[in-house]
Design a protein with these regions (language model features):
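Hydrophobic alpha-helical core bundles mediating ligand binding, dimerization, or RNAP-core interactions
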Residues: 20, 118, 122-129
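Helix-loop segments that flank and shape redox-cofactor active sites
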Residues: 22-45, 63-71, 128-136
Length: 136
C-alpha cells in the first residue's frame, strides 16, 4: 500500500491542510500592528512565529535529501520526541539558534511574504504528499 492510500495518513494531511489554510487566512488579515505584537514566546513577535513555522513548508518544498544508510532498530516517534525534548536534547541545545533564525527571517521578509508561504506553498506540498509513493 502506498503511504498516500493509508486512511490515517490522509486524515493527517487533511488536518495539516486545514491548519495551513488558517495560518494563511489569519496572516492575510493581520494589521501591521498585529504582526509586530508580542507573542507568548519571549522576544518573538507574530512575524517571528510565522517565520519559524513557515520553515517547515520551505523544507518540504525542497527536493528530499538522499536517504541515509541506517543500521540498528528503528525508533518510534515517542522515542525520538523523548530524546528531542530531554534535558540537553536538541530542543534545548538548538533553541537559541532557532530563535535567532526566526528573528532574522522575520526582519528579512515582509509579513505578506511570510503568510504567502502558507498560501502558495501549502497547497502544492499537500497535493504532492497526497500522491506520494512510499519512497517519494
Amino acid at each position: 500500500m502506498f503511504v498516500a492510500d493509508d486512511p490515517l495518513y490522509l486524515h493527517r494531511l487533511d488536518a495539516l491542510e486545514q491548519t495551513w489554510q488558517v495560518w494563511s487566512q489569519l496572516g492575510g488579515s493581520l494589521s501591521e500592528t498585529q504582526w509586530s505584537a508580542a507573542s507568548r514566546c519571549p522576544g518573538w513577535d507574530v512575524a517571528c512565529l510565522y517565520a519559524h513555522h513557515s520553515q517547515f513548508l520551505l523544507a518540504l518544498s525542497a527536493p528530499p535529501p538522499h536517504a541515509p544508510d541506517v543500521s540498528g532498530q528503528p525508533q518510534s516517534a515517542v522515542q525520538v520526541l523523548r530524546a528531542f525534548n530531554a534535558p540537553g536534547g536538541v530542543a534545548s541545545t538548538a533553541a537559541p539558534a532557532v530563535a535567532d533564525q526566526a528573528a532574522r527571517e522575520a526582519t528579512q521578509h515582509k509579513p505578506a511574504e511570510l503568510a504567502e508561504r502558507f498560501t502558495g506553498l501549502g497547497p502544492v506540498i499537500i497535493r504532492r504528499l497526497r500522491t506520494a509513493g512510499p519512497t517519494s
